[in-house]
Every structure is written in structure tokens, then in C-alpha cells.
């Protein structure tokens, strides 16, 4: 053994060839934390000191190569002064450079995934051989930063600036065949031939058949582009990427600027440019929020995994109620490998559900994400039925009938008599109390809520609602099934609206107050979209459905009359009474036309102004900042109440629920992180400025206490 550490070992393989193996003890994956970086330095020094070494193969002792940096260390590191961050990155790069500058050839053998620092380690090698099932990429822009271990320097010099910009700015994982096509790797082999492939390359380099020094040289030099080529490549890319990323996500464009600025430098000077830009991005609030989101997502996955121990395996599912929603649920279950019965009382609803599933599967085939054979397999896993004949062996039933408590209670009681005693019943409801629905059941311990968001195939969140009598097994089994469907489940306790809708309706309440104060809804939409929402509140209500919003508002007003009941008519009342129901019937706040692709396109319709006129009670002058605060303050305060009331267990789950469920701007991190970014004391003072708007704007006593004590939601 030439070197042995807790993360890295170096041992002789054969005739002067050594294997530098990453295998971080006590972890399921390899990552670049302080320990690993320090051991890499020591391992490289040990190789340099051993004259018998003729070549180095870099490998992993785990199912994946290296997943990247240890993100948990970013939180503390990024609080350091900018100069210290720059120094830290340059020190790390000295280690990578020392490996790259070894007097012997080097080959990286890539298995599983090599992301971020993992791929950057491979780029420092002379050759790369990749398993045909592996994926590689530089996903740092998703964290609000860009690659900091030489990725913006080595990758453009290896695969060309255009390809490198595409890889870095998109942050996507790339398949082996695509990596080979652009020259990011030198060979692709079957997983079982990975070491043999690496040995073949290293032996050919040692023998002189391959000139490893010539292969290494372009990575040490400036980019081979003249001034005109540089201008065309970089200016075009910056314009395109800025349009794609939008103004709130600076990292992709900053990555291009870094590549451009370093284009005329050799490796060492180029790395200084990279380090300076990396440190600048690391200090932004966007990076703080996106890293916080990543860590919150990891927390969600840990909590969901904790349910696995007691969860029952779902081998056969069923959905009650076909149509678009039932078809979406059936599709999601089947495409992820769980066969599902789809029952309805009407043949036409069954057909609608099957058409929906077939359409979604067909779309995946068209995009190359699914083979026709897999599509047929998924369709065969959806069994339509008008009866309960095959329900005896079902493990979980998702009830997705009309949003009416009496209908749901009747259907749930009926199906309970048709399934085995330990089958789980889950109601897909957005507002109806799980405790209320449970009253119709003989086995309420087997009953939970399972709230899917529309469209099911696109929305990542599922709220699993625990009722007063729901057993832990029922909750755990539903969480496990949601995960199996490829969703991100969050367990919440029962209350009107659960987490997401309970928080969303105060936001809509702020919007209603603005419209009643004479503020143009088109202006409100533009302001909130600029703030970062995927769509403004008027457009969102049209998409959700004015009738759905009207019903939800009434449910919330009944549940929380002290702050959500408004005696005055609102914009939603006026539109509902005028039968302007949104996209579903072509007119809501906006009117809708069909575009060339057959999708609804919103257009302004002046007739809506007459409909809204009776509910405008005053003409207030408000700034854009007022518009944001009228809507965001009640949303944030309701999120605080959900946490205080125990509806959601942690701040991380609350924030992720809003990001995944209603598209809360990710670069702002969620409602509670948004409060933290303002400062809890400052947020309380801000809310107090709008106290005259009603109880939705009144901070809780506990929040005032947090403000007084200088506390935060995330430390």
C-alpha cells in the first residue's frame, strides 16, 4: 500500500501501475469534503515520491464515482470573506494541478455518476474511460454558483467552448454516448470492463503508443479561439443563456463570463479568474437560498426514507375516479412500475383517464424518454374497470372523485367494504378535512390524505395528510408509495387547506385586496412575475379555475373565520357569478385563445373591467413594493402559523412544500428563508406597516418573540 487514508487509498495493481481509489469510510457516496481534499494532496505526494510508479488509474470503491463537493460545508465556507474563499479554491486547485502535472500518465475510470468536483477530478486526468451506464456533469449552477475546481478552465479546453458552455450553463447530467461524442471521455465500456478498459489505456500510454503529454498540453494553454471567434462564441452564448436563465439566476451567465475572461490565459492564470468569480457568486443571496433548498431537499429525503422501516410494500394500487386527475395518477403509478386499477362508474370517464395516460406516455416516447415497448408495458399496467371485482388484492386505494365531502365519504365507505383489512385508503383532496372524511369509515386508522397537485405528471409534491386516527403504518405506506411514484412527499397534519393551500389562500387574499383597492390585475401579475413567481396571481387563478378558487376560499374562510373571512364581495366572486371560470371555459381575468401548438394563450379582455367594477371599493396609490408586501406578508405569516401549529414539522418541509407545490421562487428559498433574508425583526416591522389591512397581516406572538431574541428559522 503506497497510501492509506479514510477517503483515499493508493495501491499497486501491476508492473508500476497504481490505483488511486476514492472510498470514503462511513458514507454511501464519495464527496470532496475537507478530509478528502487533504488526503488527495497526501496521496499525490506519495505517488510523486515513489519512483516505481509508471501510471495512475483513478477509481471509486462505491457504486458512484464522486458526487461532488460536500454541500453541507458550503454553508460555513460561504460565510467567509471573499478573499478567503478565493484562497481556499486556489489551494484546492493546487492539489488538482499537482495530480495533473504528475510525470506519469493518468486515467480516470468513471462509474455511476461523476458530478461537480467528481468530474473536475476526471478532467485533471489525461484520459477518461466511462461505464456505458454512467453519467457526468457540472450541476453547480443549480446551487447559484459555477464549477470551482477547474471545470470552467479544463472543460472548454477539452471539448471546445460551445460544448462546455452548454454543459456548464445547463448543469445537466450527460450520458456516456454524449460525453464520448464531444470528447469529454476517450472510451465507453460495459461496467464490468471498466478496470480492464482503464488498464488498456494506461498501458498504451506507458508504452508510448499514446502520447499522454501531448494529450495533456491543450488543458495547460489558452483557448484556441481568435478574437472574432471569441466574440461570436461568448456574446451569442451570454445573450441566449441570459434569456433562458432569467435575471434572478446569475450563475450561468457568470460562468460564461469567466470562461471568456480566462480564454487568453494558460491554466494557472485562468484558475485565478475562476476562483474570483466563484467567490463572488458564493456570497450572493441566490447561492444561499439555492444551497438551502438543496439541503432542505436532502432533509426531506431523509425524513421520507425514515418511513421505509414500517411501510407495507405496495404491489397493487387502485384509483377511484378516472378523468384527467385519475388518468394522471394512474399514469404516474404505472410508468414508475406499480400496476394500478382505474375505476369509475362512467365508461366515458374511464376513456378520458386512459386517453390522458396514453397521451402522457406518447409524449415521453416522442421525446425519446421511453421506448414504445415500455409504453405498452405501462399501458398494460393500467386496468380500467367499472366494478370492484379485482379490488381484493389492492394494497392502496387513491380516491380521486369530485371535491365534495358527502360524495367522498360515500365512495370511501363503499370501497372500504371491498378491500382487505390492511389496505390503505388515501383521499386526494385539496381542502376537505381528513378527520371529517374518516368519520364514514370502520377502519379510520387505515385512512390518510394524499394530495396530488395538478398536473400530476409535472408537479413534484405530494402532501400526505395525517388524520387524528391515521396509523403510522398508513402514513409510512403512503409516503413510500408516493416516493415509488417519483414524487416528493411531505407529511402534514390535518387542517383546512393542509399546508400548501392554507398558505396559498392568504396570498390570494392579498391579491383580492389589491384589486378591490383599484390596482390593475395585469400590473400585479407583472410585478409578482418579476419578483420570481412562474405566473402572476390573476393568471394562476385562471389556470387553477375560478370555481376551484371560489370553493377553496369558502372552505378556508369557514376554517379560519377570524382572518380569512371577508364580508365584502371580491374579484373571485364577481368572475364566478359572471361564469368566467378561467382557462377551462376561455374567460377569467384574461381571455384565452388557442396557439399554434393547441395550448391556451392568455390575452387581455377589456370586458372584464366592467365585471370587476362593482368590487373596486377605493382607488389606492400603491408602489410595486407595496404590491409585493400586500401579497407576500400574509403568505409568509400563514407559513409561520403552520409551523407553530404543528401542521408541518420543520421549516425545511414548509419551505420545500411551497417551492414544489406552488412554484415559490427557488432563488428566494421559501417563505421562511425569505423572512430570514429580510431579518425576522425587520419582517415583523414590515408586517406592522400593513396592520390596517386586517388580521392576515398581524405577526404571531411567537414571531415577535423570535424578533426580540434575534432568532432565525434557519441557522
Curated annotation (Swiss-Prot):
Q: Enumerate the residues binding substrate.
A: 297, 501, 660
Sorted alphabetically, which Pfam families does this protein's record hold?
3HCDH, 3HCDH_N, ECH_1
InterPro entries per record: 3-OHacyl-CoA_DH_CS, 3-OHacyl-CoA_DH_NAD-bd, 3HC_DH_C, 6-PGluconate_DH-like_C_sf, ClpP/crotonase-like_dom_sf, Enoyl-CoA_hyd/isom_CS, Enoyl-CoA_hydra/iso, FA_oxidation_alpha_subunit
**Where does the entry annotate site (Important for catalytic activity)?**
120, 140
Q: Which residues form a coiled coil?
A: none
Which pathway does it operate in?
Answer: Lipid metabolism; fatty acid beta-oxidation
Q: Which UniProt keywords apply?
A: Fatty acid metabolism, Isomerase, Lipid degradation, Lipid metabolism, Lyase, Multifunctional enzyme, NAD, Oxidoreductase
Spans annotated as 3-hydroxyacyl-CoA dehydrogenase: 312-715
Q: What does the record give as the active site?
A: 451
GO cellular component, as recorded: fatty acid beta-oxidation multienzyme complex
Give residues annotated as binding NAD(+).
325, 344, 401-403, 408, 430, 454
Task: Locate the transmembrane regions by residue number.
Answer: none
Listed GO molecular functions?
Answer: 3-hydroxybutyryl-CoA epimerase activity; delta(3)-delta(2)-enoyl-CoA isomerase activity; enoyl-CoA hydratase activity; long-chain-3-hydroxyacyl-CoA dehydrogenase activity; NAD+ binding
Give the UniProt record's GO annotations in the biological process aspect. Answer: fatty acid beta-oxidation
Reactions catalysed, as given in the entry: a (3S)-3-hydroxyacyl-CoA + NAD(+) = a 3-oxoacyl-CoA + NADH + H(+); a (3S)-3-hydroxyacyl-CoA = a (2E)-enoyl-CoA + H2O; a 4-saturated-(3S)-3-hydroxyacyl-CoA = a (3E)-enoyl-CoA + H2O; (3S)-3-hydroxybutanoyl-CoA = (3R)-3-hydroxybutanoyl-CoA
Task: Quote the EC number.
Answer: 4.2.1.17, 5.1.2.3, 5.3.3.8, 1.1.1.35
Region Enoyl-CoA hydratase/isomerase: start-end pairs: 1-190
Give the highest taxon in the source lineage: Bacteria
What family is this? In the N-terminal section; belongs to the enoyl-CoA hydratase/isomerase family. In the C-terminal section; belongs to the 3-hydroxyacyl-CoA dehydrogenase family.
Per UniProt, subunit arrangement is:
Heterotetramer of two alpha chains (FadB) and two beta chains (FadA).
> Sorted alphabetically, which PANTHER family does this protein's record hold?
TRIFUNCTIONAL ENZYME SUBUNIT ALPHA (PTHR43612), TRIFUNCTIONAL ENZYME SUBUNIT ALPHA, MITOCHONDRIAL (PTHR43612:SF3)
Q: What does this protein do?
A: Involved in the aerobic and anaerobic degradation of long-chain fatty acids via beta-oxidation cycle. Catalyzes the formation of 3-oxoacyl-CoA from enoyl-CoA via L-3-hydroxyacyl-CoA. It can also use D-3-hydroxyacyl-CoA and cis-3-enoyl-CoA as substrate.
Q: What is this protein called?
A: Fatty acid oxidation complex subunit alpha
Query: Which species?
Result: Pseudomonas putida (strain GB-1)
Give the gene symbol: fadB
Amino acid at each position: 500500500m503506497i497510501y492509506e487514508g479514510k477517503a483515499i487509498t493508493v495501491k499497486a495493481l501491476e508492473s508500476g501501475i497504481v490505483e488511486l481509489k476514492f472510498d470514503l469510510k462511513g458514507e454511501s457516496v464519495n464527496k470532496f469534503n475537507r478530509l478528502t481534499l487533504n488526503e488527495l494532496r497526501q496521496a499525490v505526494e506519495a505517488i510523486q515520491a515513489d519512483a516505481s510508479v509508471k501510471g495512475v488509474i483513478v477509481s471509486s470503491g462505491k457504486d458512484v464515482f464522486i458526487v461532488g463537493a460536500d454541500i453541507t460545508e458550503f454553508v460555513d465556507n460561504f460565510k467567509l470573506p471573499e478573499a478567503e474563499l478565493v484562497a481556499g479554491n486556489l489551494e484546492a486547485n493546487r492539489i488538482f494541478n499537482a495530480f495533473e502535472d504528475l510525470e506519469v500518465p493518468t486515467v480516470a475510470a468513471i462509474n455511476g455518476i461523476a458530478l461537480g468536483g467528481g468530474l473536475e477530478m476526471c478532467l485533471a486526468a489525461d484520459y477518461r474511460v466511462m461505464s456505458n451506464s454512467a453519467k457526468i456533469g457540472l450541476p453547480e449552477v443549480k446551487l447559484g454558483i459555477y464549477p470551482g475546481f477547474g471545470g470552467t478552465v479544463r472543460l472548454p479546453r477539452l471539448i471546445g467552448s460551445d460544448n462546455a458552455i452548454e454543459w456548464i450553463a445547463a448543469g445537466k447530467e450527460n450520458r456516456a454516448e454524449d460525453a464520448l461524442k464531444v470528447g469529454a471521455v476517450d472510451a465507453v465500456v460495459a461496467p464490468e470492463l471498466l478496470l480492464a478498459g482503464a488498464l488498456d489505456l494506461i498501458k498504451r500510454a506507458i508504452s508510448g503508443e499514446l502520447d499522454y503529454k501531448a494529450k495533456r498540453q491543450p488543458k495547460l494553454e489558452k483557448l484556441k479561439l481568435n478574437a472574432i471567434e471569441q466574440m461570436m462564441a461568448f456574446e451569442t452564448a451570454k445573450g441566449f443563456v441570459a434569456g433562458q436563465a432569467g435575471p434572478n439566476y446569475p450563475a450561468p451567465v457568470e460562468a460564461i463570463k469567466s470562461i471568456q475572461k480566462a480564454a487568453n490565459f494558460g491554466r494557472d492564470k485562468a484558475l485565478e479568474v475562476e476562483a474570483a468569480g466563484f467567490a463572488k457568486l458564493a456570497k450572493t443571496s441566490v447561492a444561499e437560498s439555492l444551497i438551502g433548498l438543496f439541503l432542505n431537499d436532502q432533509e426531506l429525503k431523509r425524513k421520507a426514507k425514515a418511513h421505509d422501516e414500517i411501510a407495507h410494500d405496495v404491489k397493487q394500487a387502485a384509483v377511484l375516479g378516472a378523468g384527467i386527475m385519475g388518468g394522471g395518477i394512474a399514469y404516474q403509478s404505472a410508468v414508475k412500475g406499480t400496476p394500478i386499477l382505474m375505476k369509475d362508474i362512467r365508461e366515458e370517464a374511464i376513456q378520458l383517464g386512459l386517453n390522458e395516460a396514453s397521451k402522457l406516455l406518447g409524449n415521453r416516447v416522442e421525446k425519446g424518454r421511453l421506448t414504445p415497448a415500455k409504453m405498452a408495458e405501462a399501458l398494460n399496467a393500467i386496468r380500467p374497470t367499472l366494478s370492484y371485482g379485482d379490488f381484493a388484492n389492492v394494497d392502496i386505494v387513491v380516491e380521486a372523485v369530485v371535491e365534495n365531502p358527502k360524495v367522498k365519504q360515500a365512495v370511501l365507505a363503499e370501497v372500504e367494504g371491498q378491500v382487505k383489512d390492511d389496505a390503505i385508503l388515501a383521499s386526494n383532496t385539496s381542502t376537505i378535512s381528513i378527520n371529517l372524511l374518516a368519520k364514514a369509515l370502520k377502519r379510520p386508522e387505515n385512512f390518510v390524505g394524499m394530495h396530488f397537485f395538478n398536473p400530476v405528471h409535472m408537479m413534484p409534491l405530494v402532501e400526505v395528510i395525517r388524520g387524528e386516527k391515521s396509523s403510522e403504518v398508513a402514513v409510512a405506506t403512503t409516503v413510500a408509495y408516493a416516493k415509488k411514484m417519483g414524487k416528493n412527499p411531505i407529511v402534514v397534519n390535518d387542517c383546512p387547506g393542509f399546508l400548501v393551500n392554507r398558505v396559498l389562500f392568504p396570498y390570494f387574499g392579498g391579491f383580492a385586496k389589491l384589486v378591490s383597492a383599484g390596482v390593475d390585475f395585469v400590473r400585479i401579475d407583472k410585478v409578482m412575475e418579476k419578483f420570481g413567481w412562474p405566473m402572476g396571481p390573476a393568471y394562476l387563478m385562471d389556470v387553477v379555475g375560478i370555481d376551484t378558487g371560489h370553493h377553496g376560499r369558502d372552505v378556508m374562510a369557514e376554517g379560519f373565520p377570524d382572518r380569512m373571512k371577508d364580508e365584502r364581495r371580491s374579484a373571485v366572486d364577481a368572475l364566478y357569478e359572471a361564469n368566467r371560470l378561467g382557462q377551462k371555459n376561455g374567460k377569467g381575468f384574461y381571455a384565452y385563445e388557442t396557439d399554434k401548438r393547441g395550448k391556451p394563450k392568455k390575452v387581455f379582455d377589456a370586458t372584464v373591467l366592467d365585471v370587476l367594477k362593482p368590487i373596486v371599493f377605493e382607488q389606492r396609490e400603491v408602489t410595486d413594493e407595496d404590491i409585493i408586501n400586500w401579497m407576500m406578508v400574509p403568505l409568509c405569516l400563514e407559513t409561520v402559523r403552520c409551523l407553530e401549529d404543528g401542521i408541518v414539522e420543520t421549516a425545511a418541509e414548509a419551505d420545500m412544500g411551497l417551492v414544489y407545490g406552488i412554484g415559490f421562487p427557488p432563488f428566494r428559498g421559501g417563505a421562511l428563508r425569505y423572512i430570514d433574508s429580510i431579518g425576522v425583526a425587520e419582517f415583523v416591522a414590515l408586517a406592522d406597516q400593513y396592520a390596517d389591512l386586517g388580521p392576515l397581516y398581524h405577526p404571531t406572538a411567537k414571531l415577535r418573540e423570535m424578533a426580540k431574541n434575534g432568532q432565525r428559522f434557519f441557522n
